[in-house]
Amino acid sequence: MGREPFNLKNLEMRIINNKKDAIQELKRISSRTNSENNNKINLIVEEILQEVKTYGDIAVEKYTKKFDGFNPDPMQISEDHLKDAWDEIDSNLKRSLEVAHKRIKKFHEKEIPQSFTIKGEHGDTVQRRWRPVKNAGIYIPGGRAAYPSTVLMNAIPAKVAGVEEIIMVSPGNKEGEINKTVLAAAHLSGIKKVFRIGGAQAIGALAFGTNQINKVDVITGPGNIYVTTAKKLIYGSTGIDSLAGPSEILVIADETAQSTHIASDLLAQAEHDPLASSILLTTSKNQAKEVLEELYKKIDDHPRKEICMQSIKNWGLIVICENYELCIELSNNFAPEHLEILALDSKKILEGIENAGAIFLGKWTPEAVGDYLAGPNHTLPTSGNSRFSGSLGVETFMKNTSIIEFNEESLKVNSLDIINLAESEGLHSHANSVKIRFED
């Protein structure tokens, strides 16, 4: 028992067939971003944020030149340019964006939290009132790929929530240009303000405000380690959605699942990033070997071969499990961002799942469906955070307020209990604030 060393040509991927080793390996993968460099990155980001806070646009331009290699002047992309981008993209792509927009909007409209009022028997009322934040900033990554889907997934719930002003930031390429499809998605989503800046300096601009960029109440959207660190450091004075780590998928499968489907779905994560993680929990030893073979075939001529190889080699894993119960236990411990269930009794497995950002059931539901147009948000908790949090949604862009109104009768009826509780905490002025209202 223990590890079976597998080395298929240049592809290395761990196969484990016992619970103890599986738990240790999943723990290692989950903590893959806990680097010794984190303190160094914190210091760099703190300096950037402080400069942006002090010098505003000048600091933003400085760091954009330094890290992105272009002068972002002018910083804002005009609304006409956004409209031009929409007009210029392929008609088929335009249709696909519209289909995705419609489905995502329909789902998020169901998420709108409802205000409510409870009336007490003595005339008191208590209310929960929901209101949108005034403005929000959304960060759209550049770099290895363009993500128009991320524009939709961040902008649509903000729009549905009723946010008055949405400011989008995204790093330009060396020529200072943002991908045309990303700009088209911004136009479709009704975004008026787009700035071609990225990195920690963009987060600082949104958090503190500059002459050109208004300070926002909430910042959402994924980014690299510098963006994530900046969001962590400004949290408390500005709201954020989450601290996104590298993408991850966990597939639970049995012998009925097709190995070529599994391999394709694992690679769909691996191609994102060298730190992306692709994990298979299977009840079939033969399937484990077949999936490895399929991975090699598909990676060999993949346009992002090197990224896939690094991801699979360092953060890929196959675990051969005795039964569904072990698959469920290991999955819940790992708490994946994306969970696919490709098994004959997928609904039974689903009943045991407690921790997952999003769950994809059956052979006709590859994770890519959720990435683009199923409707639920694709901004999901990573690094085990689905144990206590969920996806980005309409509530991310809203806040609630409690409204309380007592009359003389309701305060009198409840006064003794309020006084008793206040005095038990030694807060006598609290108690007196009730007593004094009934003194002659």
From Swiss-Prot:
**Pathway assigned in UniProt:** Amino-acid biosynthesis; L-histidine biosynthesis; L-histidine from 5-phospho-alpha-D-ribose 1-diphosphate: step 9/9
Tell me which domain of life the UniProt entry assigns to the organism this sequence originates from. Answer: Bacteria
Q: Which InterPro entries does the UniProt entry name for this protein? A: Ald_DH/histidinol_DH (IPR016161), Histidinol_DH_CS (IPR001692), Histidinol_DH_monofunct (IPR022695), Hstdl_DH (IPR012131)
Example GO CC term: the record gives: cytosol
Catalytic site residues?
A: 337 (proton acceptor), 338 (proton acceptor)
Q: How is the cofactor bound?
A: Binds 1 zinc ion per subunit.
Q: Which reaction does it catalyse?
A: L-histidinol + 2 NAD(+) + H2O = L-histidine + 2 NADH + 3 H(+)
Q: Enumerate the cofactors the protein uses.
A: Zn(2+)
Record-listed E.C. numbers: 1.1.1.23
User: Which keywords belong to this entry?
Assistant: Amino-acid biosynthesis, Histidine biosynthesis, Metal-binding, NAD, Oxidoreductase, Zinc
Molecular function (GO) terms for this protein are:
histidinol dehydrogenase activity; NAD binding; zinc ion binding
Q: Tell me which Pfam families the record gives.
A: Histidinol_dh
Family per similarity comment: Belongs to the histidinol dehydrogenase family.
Protein function: Catalyzes the sequential NAD-dependent oxidations of L-histidinol to L-histidinaldehyde and then to L-histidine.
* Record-linked HAMAP family: HisD (MF_01024)
PANTHER family noted in UniProt: HISTIDINE BIOSYNTHESIS TRIFUNCTIONAL PROTEIN (PTHR21256:SF2), HISTIDINOL DEHYDROGENASE HDH (PTHR21256)
Instruction: Indicate what this protein is called per its UniProt record.
Output: Histidinol dehydrogenase
